[in-house]
C-alpha cells in the first residue's frame, strides 16, 4: 500500500508515498483532501481529510465524478465519505 493525494485544495502541496513505506505529511492549506492507495484505486481504497473548514468541498465533489470512473468496486465509497463532511 501507499498514500498519494489525488484531489486537494488550490495551492496545497501534493504527496505520493512509496510502496510499503511510512509517510508523514503536514497539511497547511485549509480544505478537503482526497488520497488513495495507488495500486488499489480500482477498489476505491481512498480516504478524505478535512483541514479546518471544507472550503473546497463543492469543487472536490465536482472533480471526484471523473476520478471515480476508475472504481470497479465500492463505487459509492468516496461519495459516502464526502457526505459526512
Model-assigned labels for residue ranges:
Residues 1-85:
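Extracytoplasmic copper-binding redox domains, predominantly the cupredoxin/blue-copper superfamily
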Amino acid at each position: 500500500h501507499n498514500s498519494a493525494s489525488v484531489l486537494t485544495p488550490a495551492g496545497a502541496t501534493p504527496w505520493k508515498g512509496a510502496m510499503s513505506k511510512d509517510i508523514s505529511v503536514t497539511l497547511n492549506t485549509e480544505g478537503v483532501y482526497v488520497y488513495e492507495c495507488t495500486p488499489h484505486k480500482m477498489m476505491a481504497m481512498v480516504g478524505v481529510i478535512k483541514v479546518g473548514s471544507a472550503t473546497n468541498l463543492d469543487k472536490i465533489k465536482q472533480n471526484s465524478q471523473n476520478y471515480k470512473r476508475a472504481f470497479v468496486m465500492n463505487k459509492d465509497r468516496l461519495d459516502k465519505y464526502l457526505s459526512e463532511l
